[in-house]
Amino acid sequence: MIGIIGAMDMEVNGLKERMQNAEVETIGTIDFYKGTIQGVPCVVARSGVGKVNAAICAQIMALMYRPKAII
């Protein structure tokens, strides 16, 4: 699984549109979209702007979904 984090909607909307079999899970205030993009298992999230928001989102993603990489 690959984790992808964007700060704003415009950074993740295209990925969410291309995602197949998407399931949404909300943890705290962050929506995580889990599915596949071109057959690759992915989880996509919008963290919000800022280093702290990105770090919180990355930590939750790492603990809950165990991706091989986070972009």
Which positions does each model-derived feature cover?
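Accessory terminal and edge-of-domain segments that mediate assembly/interaction
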Residues: 1-71
